[in-house]
Amino acid sequence: MKHSLNALLIFLIITSAWGGSKGPLDQLEKGGETAQSADPQWEQLNNKNLSMPLLPADFHKENTVTNDWIPEGEEDDDYLDLEKIFSEDDDYIDIVDSLSVSPTDSDVSAGNILQLFHGKSRIQRLNILNAKFAFNLYRVLKDQVNTFDNIFIAPVGISTAMGMISLGLKGETHEQVHSILHFKDFVNASSKYEITTIHNLFRKLTHRLFRRNFGYTLRSVNDLYIQKQFPILLDFKTKVREYYFAEAQIADFSDPAFISKTNNHIMKLTKGLIKDALENIDPATQMMILNCIYFKGSWVNKFPVEMTHNHNFRLNEREVVKVSMMQTKGNFLAANDQELDCDILQLEYVGGISMLIVVPHKMSGMKTLEAQLTPRVVERWQKSMTNRTREVLLPKFKLEKNYNLVESLKLMGIRMLFDKNGNMAGISDQRIAIDLFKHQGTITVNEEGTQATTVTTVGFMPLSTQVRFTVDRPFLFLIYEHRTSCLLFMGRVANPSRS
């Protein structure tokens, strides 16, 4: 068996366009997660038959995952109707399984993840753990950037890419990834769960999130580029296609035309919002995994363009910048967290997606908030929210971020994936290692909605008669799809005047 070391390159490209949003409370009514220890047979992923029914040639006709991005030379009828393939999906998503330990048992601590799992469906449980991983990754990232830097990541894309990679991992490398991603916690939570359940749920999640006719546009595509003559295992290519809808494509990374061709492809996927994503690539690269996400949503309560005005935004105790502040009035859910000393506002998009805006009361409160952010905290916010008429002021912002996540993932404990001694024998019989995990994304938050003609109909009462939520200092934002509890995007806006 050959063991020459090759490079594995991962690109995660995300882009989001948002129509309308809202901000903090100037006057608002103040109103140890450990899974049950089990010893799952991690090698079952490799020993069990993961095969699912092979997808017909007409791949993704009614699903936005690949529908709009047909490879050159292929026709529409080469894609399939996922509505027919996944006709059972919604029932599967809503299944609530029994837990290994009752969340009311005395030996289960108050912070145990099983308490969060209680009453949740399979896919919600997986997404709770995806969010837990995302919050931990965010904490590592924010320690690597300046306090005044903006941050933007797409947790669903990162977890999907890692799940896809894990299909080809073996031994300690596989267990390390599954432990840090909390997939191991998921498997231990119920006797009905095994490793194959995780990949099945990612498959189902793709169908749920990227299906049409939800009132928003959410698109994703996974591409697997393989260097010519690289001996990638057929079993890995098959599993990646079946579970993650990633198509293996032949590539010549030493060809300068590859960069321009891929950039054009990405630009098409993201509707022109991400350009020149690839600037250079190591000719020695053997495999590149590309995950792209595009989102555009319309606010339920829109912001009249004529109400946008210049407003002070406090960067810190001493510095202030002028920003374009949007303004609207309507019924909004909001909460006050006295423990973390912050206000939370929920801004709804059409179709079951919403953005949580989290604003510390004190300028120094961001560090505490970032350190304490967990799925349990978010659930506490959501359960304590009250609905009433509020005036909302939120700055327009656009974030463009580009990260190499290798060092961040290493700091989290995922080291063997990037080491020459890592075991990726399920991908190739040659020794390979990942030397780049690129995560790039863009988000734009403004007044726009799908029905711009209606945005001028919002009326305003005198400010003194309303509860006002003004976002005029650094804040966090979290974007969730509610039925699946999926954390799509999250970030920090420290300075709206900068990208």
Curated annotation (Swiss-Prot):
Reported effect, residue 204 to T? Reduced heparin- and no dermatan sulfate-activated inhibition
- PROSITE patterns, sorted: SERPIN (PS00284)
Effect recorded for residue 122 to W: Greatly reduced thrombin inhibition. Normal glycosaminoglycan affinity
Q: Where is this site: Reactive bond?
A: 463-464
What tissue expression does the UniProt record report for this protein? Expressed predominantly in liver. Also present in plasma.
Q: Residue ranges of region Glycosaminoglycan-binding site?
A: 192-212
Q: PANTHER family, per this entry?
A: HEPARIN COFACTOR 2 (PTHR11461:SF30), SERINE PROTEASE INHIBITOR, SERPIN (PTHR11461)
What is the name listed in the Swiss-Prot or TrEMBL entry for this protein? Heparin cofactor 2
Which organism is the protein's source? Homo sapiens
Which gene produces this protein?
Answer: SERPIND1
